[in-house]
């Protein structure tokens, strides 16, 4: 019965948990470890959708047989500058280099998602254009030291207070940049959870 259907978010990201909670659909979370290396043969859009699917599949394989009818949501976000995905920084210097490159210009943020249920997959992605104004080396250093954006694609969190002074434009879904395109995900989940819609 649809009222007993379980939604599982294939992520421990606090940002994705907060965003999915906005839909009003009850859910659980499951941690997942997969190789998130981009396939150079695929486009950035294809990569975020494929990694999202791999995350959802990994969770689906790990759940018990009585939970096999669960709906599993996987998601992946990347920052793309001049056609090149930036991913998450490995250390301070990498984060500094990324932010130095992003400041003073616009870039794309892509978030892919995959919903698995009853052997079927719904995959999609959202694109948002973000413009970050000029930042001095001192401002970049302070941001990294205070916010520690090492778990964030592109080395920044758009919701971070210290970045607010530098975001000069957003074209597209703000929540997509945070980590989940809430309206697109809700539209895809709504038919599976009609009692919650």
Swiss-Prot record:
Top-rank taxon: Bacteria
E.C. designation(s): 3.6.1.9
Main EC class the enzyme belongs to: hydrolase
Sites annotated Important for substrate specificity: 15, 77, 159
GO BP: nucleotide metabolic process
Cell location: Cytoplasm
Cofactor(s) recorded in Swiss-Prot or TrEMBL: a divalent metal cation
Classification via InterPro entries: ITPase-like_fam, Maf-like
One CC-aspect GO term: cytoplasm
Catalytic residues identified in the record: 76 (proton acceptor)
Function, as annotated: Nucleoside triphosphate pyrophosphatase that hydrolyzes dTTP and UTP. May have a dual role in cell division arrest and in preventing the incorporation of modified nucleotides into cellular nucleic acids.
Name this polypeptide is given: dTTP/UTP pyrophosphatase
Organism phylogeny: Bacteria, Pseudomonadati, Chlorobiota, Chlorobiia, Chlorobiales
């Amino acid at each position: 019965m649809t009222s007993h259907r379980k939604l599982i978010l294939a992520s421990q990201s606090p940002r994705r948990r907060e965003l999915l909670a906005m839909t009003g659909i009850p859910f659980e979370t499951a941690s997942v470890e997969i190789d998130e290396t981009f396939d150079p043969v695929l486009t950035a859009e294809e990569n975020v959708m494929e990694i999202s699917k791999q995350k959802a599949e990994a969770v689906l394989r790990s759940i018990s047989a009585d939970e096999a009818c669960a709906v599993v949501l996987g998601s992946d976000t990347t920052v793309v500058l001049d056609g090149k995905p930036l991913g998450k920084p490995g250390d301070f210097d990498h984060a500094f280099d990324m932010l130095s490159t992003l400041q003073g210009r616009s870039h794309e943020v892509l978030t892919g998602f995959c919903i698995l249920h009853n052997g079927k997959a719904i995959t999609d992605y959202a694109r948002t254009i973000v413009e970050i104004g000029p930042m001095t080396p001192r401002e970049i250093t302070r941001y990294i030291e205070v916010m520690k954006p090492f778990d964030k694609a592109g080395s920044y969190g758009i919701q971070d207070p210290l970045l607010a002074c530098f975001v000069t434009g957003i074209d597209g879904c703000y929540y997509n940049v945070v980590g989940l395109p809430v309206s697109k995900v809700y539209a895809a989940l709504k038919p599976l959870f009609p009692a919650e819609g």
